Structure formats: structure tokens, C-alpha cells
Amino acid sequence: MRTEYCGQLRLSHVGQQVTLCGWVNRRRDLGSLIFIDMRDREGIVQVFFDPDRADALKLASELRNEFCIQVTGTVRARDEKNINRDMATGEIEVLASSLTIINRADVLPLDSNHVNTEEARLKYRYLDLRRPEMAQRLKTRAKITSLVRRFMDDHGFLDIETPMLTKATPEGARDYLVPSRVHKGKFYALPQSPQLFKQLLMMSGFDRYYQIVKCFRDEDLRADRQPEFTQIDVETSFMTAPQVREVMEALVRHLWLEVKGVDLGDFPVMTFAEAERRYGSDKPDLRNPMELTDVADLLKSVEFAVFAGPANDPKGRVAALRVPGGASLTRKQIDEYGNFVKIYGAKGLAYIKVNERAKGLEGINSPVAKFLNAEIIEDILDRTAAQDGDMIFFGADNKKIVADAMGALRLKVGKDLGLTDESKWAPLWVIDFPMFEDDGEGGLTAMHHPFTSPKDMTAAELKAAPENAVANAYDMVINGYEVGGGSVRIHNGDMQQTVFGILGINEEEQREKFGFLLDALKYGTPPHAGLAFGLDRLTMLLTGTDNIRDVIAFPKTTAAACLMTEAPSFANPTALAELSIQVVKKAENN
């Protein structure tokens, strides 16, 4: 039906007759001439109709936005004064000789001249996806997956599919369950990841596996989460953690070079402990120059319980955040930041405004200065490298609250004051995570998943001191986003059962849920390690959007609903009966 794409016409096509198919993006009626911007997935070109082709001109007068049309015409160079430098096709136009209206469009529910609500965009997603910026994001996503496949193929990885209908296993979030019609009362689970299957593939001798795969998690959503999402899933045998990181880093550098024309360079490597200490986060945004500075040792003897309490508590922390130029902040802004850190459990926000260091106590402004002597204040200013015009904020509480609150404050202040360099890319690896964390009920939970191997520990050593265990795990972080994470896996049955035991999974439950894995570990399992990238999040970064729904063709809302198809919906009673399922309404409380 067509010979060329609208957006691919250039000066080299001048004089050629072309046939185009697409949509009316805009129409301008000048009476004797009608101009339209005609759009397809590759872009927009200007088409005009003149009186010499009366039939085409007459039909063009009926055109409205989003009519689907076919145009045949001749490509012409525009006059110098009419060249549009903002369009890729701005040096040419098409003089139409014939026009076919393939399909007309009703009054549009989306307005291309205004910002539409996200609700409207999701309800009429097929119209939203016609917008050039949305089409470009999905084209970039397609390019990314193509680049990934070629890279992985070139590095000896095999693309192997794993099951979608599988067994529910604890991986940190709720499963989406699928009832079995054949096996009454039993359910499949949609996979949260192919974790165990890819490990089993390593046990099967496949050495290097990858898959671009859908995963499902029934969890509370936010801007960068979806109930169904896509992973670039990778597993290897006989490779160490640094070797896995080297290959995966090369993949991501390749993507940035091909998509953005940017060489990310070598990724720095930072331990979890260092990231938490310096940035208050295990996914630090290194574009932000500010760091947390520990000052507890300077405040142990002060007569100010807010500082002295955490300073003398082994589980406490007092950290300072120097904000360059922050002395210009108003009292209202400071109060707003004080309220902001309360979201993360902090009780408030102490501060020192550094107006003129040379004047000592007279050169600062602080509500806590009366509790601190001149020597302590000078030591704090020295340690934080404070200069005239700076602000120092303090967090004092248990270690987690201080890290969470001050880490979040660092990001917010960096953005508010323009201290974060938005033009940069700042990748890094974070390694050496704690193996376990407190589950809040006196037990332990796996910080990553229960198949992660500890670093340099035997099963006996792990059982004796699980709280000291360091996971042989690694996360890739870019600009404050965790884009991928992985680990060396447990390849020994005794170690795997030890980890299960630490997590409170008794032997009977181990057999019930993981018997197939424990059996497989008996038969010469190779050492193996892997990683998974979030394709949606990678695409989000590479296309410059801050909303993951912008890079998924048909995403769900934050309520896990599809506004277009109205999914989820009530099931047919007959279908439920075949599955032996009965929907029971909860009794309402009076």
C-alpha cells in the first residue's frame, strides 16, 4: 500500500513519486491550498494539495485529525524560506496527486494541543501510542532488546524459555495464582522470576543462559513498578562474581553507546556498608556531590540528649550533611525539610548555618549551638569541610532511620538546589550486602533471596553467626536507580538447607516447597551465578522518562488495573464452577 515511510523522506527523494500511508497529524486550510502534516511510526512529513488536482483538494477539505489516509504524490524540495529545521523532513514536502480516506475518526477523546491526564491516556492507549514521543520510546525499547540478543548471542549465551505456569515459592512478594481445572483445588503461580529454573538449567549443563522474560509480582505499586514486568535474565556456570559483573557491565556500556552515544566508562565498585555510610542508600545517585559525614564521636559528651543518646548507642548514628550554598535557605524551607525527614521516621532536623567561619560562634546561626561549645562546632565544620555560605543538616537516631532520612534528604536537596548534575551518567556496582536482615518479628529474612551464597563462610560458620554473613551479591545502580541485581548462588545442599533453616523453613516445608531443588543439588551441581536487569527500568533511563508506564505499550495503573480493557474483571460463574472456585463476599461490619 505504500512505497516509503513519511518520516524517512529526504532531499534524496526529490522528484520521486511516493505512496504514503498514515494519519493526519494536523490540517491547515488556506482555501486554494490545503496543507497536512502526515504521520506514521517513523515521523511526520508535510503534504499539500493544490487546485491543479481538484479531486484530491476537494477530498482533502474533509480531512480531520487522526483520519487514516493514503496519499500518492511527488517529493519536492522546499523553498529556502519555508525549510523547517525542527523537522527531520523539513527540507522537503509532498505534492499530492491522489488521496484515499481509509478510515475516518470520531471526535478525539485526547487533545494533542493540551496535556492529557494519565487516566485518559491509559484508557485510550491506542491513541496515546500514536504520539511521536511514545512511538519513539517503544522503538527504543525494541532496539534495546535487539542489541541485548545480539550481544548475548555473540558471548555464547543461549536463549532458553522457562515455564510461565509454575509452583509458588517464597520470593518476597505475593504470587499471582492460576487455578487448575484438571487438578481440583490446586493452583499454579505465575513466576516472580525464573530464578530456580535458570539455576536448574545450570545444573543441566547449559553454562550460559539468558531470556527476555515476563515476571509477575502482586505488590503495592509505585512509579517504577508494575504487576507484570520484563527482565533480561542471565545465569552462568563456572564464573566468579567479578567475571559476571565484567560481562554484564560490558552489555550495559554497549547499550548506552548504541542508544545514547555515551561511553559510561568503567563502573566503580562500592560495598553496601560504604554506600550506606556515605550516601544513606544502597543505590546512591553519584551525580549528587553531597555526602554524609559521621560526627557521633564529637558529640558523645554534649548535654543535648538528641545528639548524645544516639552518639553513645552502638545501634545509633549521628550524621551531618553539608549543603554547599545552603545558608541561603529560608526558615520556611528548613521547616519543610524538617517535615520531609519525618516521613522516614526522623523526629526533626537540626542544622548549622555557616555565615562566616572566621568569626567562630558569631559566624554561625543554629538552634543547637547553645548545646555545643566552640571547639565542637569547629571540629564539625572541619570534618565536613564547611565553607562560608554552607548549611549543615544533622540526623540523629538509630542507624536505619538516619540512613533513610538523610539519604532521602540528600536527594531532595540536591534536586531542589540544582546540585545534582542531571546531564551526567553515574553508574556503579554495589557489593557485599548483608546476607540477612531483621524481619521485625525476632527472626531473619533474606536480603536478596534464599538461594544467594554467603561470602567466604562454611555452612557451620553461617549457622553459628548468620547476622555476620555477607552475601556474595551485587547490584548495578545508574543515577540512583537499581537497574539490575544478582548473586553467586548456593550450589551445595548442606548450605542451602542451612539457609532455609536460618529463615525458619523447617525440613518438612523445605521438601514440600523446594524438594526438586534439593534433589538436583545432589548430582554434581556446578558453581553458578547470575543477574537480572529490569528491561522496563533500563528503557526508562535510556528514553529520559521518570515513569515506567511510558515505556510499556499497555501498562497497568498503580491499582494494577488496565483502564482500556477494564481488567481485572469478574469471571464467568460457569468458568468458576469448572475450577471448583466459589467467590465469598466478606461480611460487612456494622
From Swiss-Prot:
Assigned GO CC terms: cytosol
Entry-linked Gene3D superfamilies: Bira Bifunctional Protein, Domain 2, GAD-like domain, Nucleic acid-binding proteins
Subcellular location: Cytoplasm
Cross-referenced InterPro entries: Aa-tRNA-synt_II, aa-tRNA-synth_II, aa-tRNA-synth_II/BPL/LPL, Asp-tRNA-ligase_1, Asp-tRNA-ligase_1_N, Asp/Asn-tRNA-synth_IIb, AspRS_core, GAD-like_sf
Binding residues for ATP: R217, D218, E219, Q226, E482, G534, L535, D536, R537
Gene Ontology terms, MF aspect: aspartate-tRNA ligase activity; ATP binding; nucleic acid binding
Enzyme Commission identifier(s): 6.1.1.12
Keyword annotations: Aminoacyl-tRNA synthetase, ATP-binding, Cytoplasm, Ligase, Nucleotide-binding, Protein biosynthesis
Annotated binding of L-aspartate, by residue: E171, R217, H448, R489
Main localization of the protein described in the UniProt heading: cytoplasm
PROSITE patterns given in the database record: AA_TRNA_LIGASE_II
Subunit structure: Homodimer.
PANTHER family recorded: ASPARTATE--TRNA LIGASE, MITOCHONDRIAL (PTHR22594:SF5), ASPARTYL/LYSYL-TRNA SYNTHETASE (PTHR22594)
HAMAP family, A to Z: Asp_tRNA_synth_type1
Family named by the database record: Belongs to the class-II aminoacyl-tRNA synthetase family. Type 1 subfamily.
Protein name: Aspartate--tRNA ligase
Name of the coding gene: aspS
